[in-house]
Amino acid sequence: IKGFTTGVQHIGIPTNDINKTIEFYEALGFNIAYRTVNGAEEVAFLQLHNLMIETYQNYQTKMEYGAIDHIAIDVKNIEDLFDEVKESGIFTMLDNQVKGLPFWENGVKFFTIEGPNKEKIEFCEKL
């Protein structure tokens, strides 16, 4: 797996109020790197140096500690990585295929596994 990874891509934080979340992180020095609507969810990627936060409004946020939804690892050759992870039998797959979203300039492809503490680890490739 290590040969496919290039670093942390983003940390996903759901929100009930995306504007309030953006204002908070802007006060910390973050800038809006990308903003869009995906279905009914508003999505914003907020950047501070090499740290990227993906926040998305879903109106189901529990508003309690442990609010981070997932950690995304930046990868290359996602289809090959997916096959390797699935065939290993070591990991609990949360996705049965590589998915796509129309984010950024050319979209992204991703899939998610479950960590030993029920954390979600997303492997994501910007296209």
Show which residues each predicted segment covers.
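Vicinal oxygen chelate
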Residues: I1-K2, D83-L127
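N-terminal beta-strand motif that seeds the catalytic metal site of vicinal oxygen chelate
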Residues: I1-N19, I68-I71, C124-L127
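Core segments of cupin and vicinal oxygen chelate
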Residues: I13-M52
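Helix N-cap motif at beta-to-alpha junctions
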Residues: D17-I18, V75-E79
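Hydrophobic side chains in well-ordered alpha-helices
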Residues: T21-F24, L81-V85
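Short beta-strand micro-motifs in enzyme catalytic cores
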Residues: E42-A44, D69, G107-F111
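Short glycine/serine/proline-enriched coil/turn segments at secondary-structure junctions
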Residues: K62-E64, F103-W104
